[in-house]
Each structure stands twice: as C-alpha cells, then as structure tokens.
From Swiss-Prot:
DPCK domain mapped to chain residues: 4-202
Domain of life: Bacteria
UniProt KW keywords: ATP-binding, Coenzyme A biosynthesis, Cytoplasm, Kinase, Nucleotide-binding, Transferase
Location in the cell: Cytoplasm
Protein name (record): Dephospho-CoA kinase
Pathway the protein acts in: Cofactor biosynthesis; coenzyme A biosynthesis; CoA from (R)-pantothenate: step 5/5
Gene3D superfamilies: P-loop containing nucleotide triphosphate hydrolases (3.40.50.300)
Length: 210
C-alpha cells in the first residue's frame, strides 16, 4: 500500500519545485490545486453549485468560470470564501482520494496541498507532513519576480495564509529552501532516500497515520 506524504508551504516557498523534483525521481505526485482546477474547468462538476451560490456574474457568455471575478469576491468576503470552500473542499478531498487509489505499487507518493495547515481534514489522506520553508524576503522576491505583483500585494497574500510557525508545528519533516535550485534538488533527493527507507520498513511511520 502506497504511503502518502503531504507537501505544503507558503506562497514562494518553492513547494511546487520540490514536488516536481520528487516526480522526476518517479515518485507519484498529486496536486490539490490541479484537482481544484479540473473541478472548475469547462464542464467541471463544481460549476452548477458555484453558479447556484454565486450567480451568473462569475461566468462568461460561454459558461466558463471567470476565476478573476470569483477570486476578488472571495478575497473581499470571508463568508463568501467559506461558502466556496463548502463546495470545493469535499470535492477536492474525493478527487485526491480517487487519484491515490490508482497507485498501488509505489512505496510512497507526494500530495501537494498548499493549504494543509489551514484545512486539517486533508491530514487523514497522508502519513507524514513535509513543510517547505524559506525566509520571508526570499519568498516575497520569488513571487514578485514571477507574477509582477508589488511587494505590498505579495505581503497581503502572505498575511492571509497560515503563519510559518503554524506550518512548522504541523510538520514531521522540514526542507529549508534558502538557496539555489540545485540545493533544493539535492535536499529532495536526500528526503527521497529517507522516505523510501522508512516507508519500506514501517508503512505507518509518522504522526499523521490517517
């Protein structure tokens, strides 16, 4: 039975790069954000309920979800955000579980869940938590470089996420991504060897044995 590691981290921490390095090592990779995107893509199963709750204004004339409009609405209103999460989180959970069931031979796999610290229900899907950590200034710089957002906008996004201390408290393992991509790859390879060893000998190793 494949054991699953929940990979998480704040925006700009490098979690997606780390997840890709695991995938390069032929480790099964599941991405919660991709699952969410598929659920809200054309003909996605979440669309009818989103339309019922949020109305036609968040859809274009072709029936496609206007993600920018919806994002602004939920960012401005905690109650609207909670409403969307009531629709999306159970569907994302089910989609991840379905994808996990397609992997049976791998010793372990990676589930990339950016909001794992905030949404603890996903812990039941994993055995260990790996937090990708990085200094705040590096995180801000990375996001500004790739997105064109201002420093203030990035800082605002970070302020709405879980704190670094909260993520570290949840973690079984921490990867400090404070250097180059080469360094990140090397650290990922060390963790790969570690996980391959512990899960081959003790499949339930870790704090999170859901």
């Amino acid at each position: 039975m494949t054991a699953w590691v929940g990979l998480t981290g704040g925006i700009g921490s490098g979690k997606s790069a780390a997840a890709q390095y695991f995938a390069d090592l032929r480790v099964p990779r599941i991405d919660a954000d991709r699952a969410a995107h598929s659920l809200t893509a054309s003909d996605g199963i979440a669309l009818p309920e989103i339309r019922r709750l949020f109305g036609d204004t968040v859809f274009d004339t072709q029936g496609l979800l206007r993600r920018d409009i919806l994002r602004k609405e939920i960012f401005a209103s905690p109650s609207r955000k909670a409403l969307l999460e009531s629709v999306m989180l159970p569907l994302i959970f089910s989609e991840i579980k379905k994808q996990q069931e397609t992997f049976t031979d791998a010793v372990y796999g990676i589930v990339e869940i950016p909001l794992l610290t905030e949404k603890r229900q996903f812990i039941s899907l994993i055995r260990r938590v790996l937090t990708i950590s990085a200094p705040l200034e590096k995180r801000i710089g990375r996001v500004m470089a790739r997105s064109g957002l201002t420093r203030g906008e990035v800082a605002d996004i970070i302020s709405h996420q879980a704190s670094e201390s909260e993520r570290l408290l949840l973690a079984d393992d921490v990867l400090l991504n404070d250097g180059s991509l080469k360094s990140l790859r090397e650290k990922t390879m060390l963790l790969h060897a570690f996980y391959s060893g512990i899960f081959a000998s003790k499949p339930t190793q870790g704090k999170h044995n859901g």
